[in-house]
Amino acid sequence: LPREYAPKEVIPMLNDMKKEIYAVRGNCEAEVDQMVLQFPVMADYCILNLDGRTFYATHGHVYNENNLPPLQEGDILIHGHTHVLRAEKKESYTLLNPGSVSIPKEGNPPTYAIFENGIFMIKDFDGNIVKSIHL
């Protein structure tokens, strides 16, 4: 793990934003995580309607591009299990992965994602757009 990896320090920051967070359970989360966080984090998936688009958000260790959830034509599957950033249109859906802020893979920088004005942007910590896709 990176030297800066400090999940306990992130807890107060996340709790301060609890009304703005939709979270899903990852493959390493446990009930103790739910005990310290003030918003739900144990759901396997979350379906969001943003700007008229349906996002199926999941961690990705169960549902992913190799084991698709019940998507409709044009839906967006977003997951982060692999820690590898992706933003690509598939035949019947769009696949998004914001990468990882703490343990990025495949030589990528630490990244996060923003969805704004119909554009999914993956950014590094300096705010540079690393990858984007218009949805």
Where are these regions (language model features)?
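Generic detection of short hydrophobic beta-strand segments and adjacent strand-loop junctions
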Residues: 48, 131-135
